[in-house]
Amino acid sequence: MIKYKIIRNKNIKNNQILAISKLKDSFWPYGIKNQKKFLRSNTNINDLHILAYKNKNIVGYVNLKIKLFIKNDNIKKNKFFLFDGFIVDKLFRKVNIGKNIIKICKKRSKSEKIPIFLLCKRSVMPFYKKLNFKIILKKKYHLLNHRYKGLLMQYNLSLKKINLIKIKF
C-alpha cells in the first residue's frame, strides 16, 4: 500500500533528503551530492514536499515551492505553488502514484486558494491536461528570472481577466 506525506521544508529530515536525491538522480543524473545541494539551496522553509512511500521507501515525489507572480502590471504580488521535481520511481509507474500526488497538490491549492504553475515539455502535456491543468499561452506570461522553452501550465487560476502574468522563480 502506498502512503503519502506532506512535509514542510523546515521539517524535512536528512534521511528523507537523501532518499529524494537518490530518486531524482535516477532520472536527472547529476549525482546524489549535487541533488542534495540543489534541494537544500533551492527551497525555502515553508515550501512543501509531497512524498509517496511504499513501506519505508520513497517511490514518488514533488516539491511545491511557494513563489510570486504579478497580474496585469499590478504591483500586488500573488502567491503560487511551483510544481517542481515531480518524479515516480520507474518500478512504480502506471499505478496512479503520480495522479495521487497531483490530487494532493490540487487539494492543497484549492484549500489555500493558491494556483499551481508548472513548466513541462510538450511530450508530457497530455498527462497534465487530463488532470485539469491548462496551458498558459506564451503571449500571456513573462518569466522574470528564468529561461524555458517548454510549456507553462496552471491549475486553479482564472485567466479571463488576465492579459499578462509576470512570474518570478
Regions found by a protein language model. Give the residues of each.
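Conserved N-terminal entry element of GNAT/NAT acetyltransferase domains
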Residues: 1-15, 161-168
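Residue-level detector of beta-propeller blades
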Residues: 6, 58, 135-137
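A conserved beta-strand-loop-helix scaffold within acyl/acetyltransferase catalytic domains
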Residues: 9-12, 17-87
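Conserved acetyl-CoA-binding loop-helix of GNAT-fold acetyltransferases
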Residues: 88, 94-107
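Short glycine/proline-centered loop/turn elements that form peptide/ligand docking sites
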Residues: 98-102, 123-124, 140-147
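Conserved GNAT acetyl-CoA-binding A-motif
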Residues: 108-121
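Conserved catalytic-core motifs of GNAT/GCN5-like acyltransferases
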Residues: 129, 134-152
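Acidic/histidine-enriched, glycine/proline-rich intrinsically disordered or flexible terminal extensions
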Residues: 146-169
